[in-house]
Amino acid sequence: LKVPDLPLPESYKKALELAKDDLAREIXI
């Protein structure tokens, strides 16, 4: 997942990290 190099709201960055964690868990990493 490519994260844009832009200033993002903390809530958005947190949601993005949670989404990546969920994705990794599903794949199974």
From Swiss-Prot:
* Gene Ontology CC terms, in alphabetical order: extracellular region
Give the UniProt keywords, A-Z.
Answer: Neurotoxin, Secreted, Toxin
Q: What is its main location?
A: secreted
Q: Name one GO molecular function term.
A: toxin activity
Protein location: Secreted
Tissues in which the protein is found: Expressed by the venom gland.
Q: Which family is this protein grouped under? A: Belongs to the scolopendra toxin 8 family.
State the protein's name: Scolopendra 8011.73 Da toxin
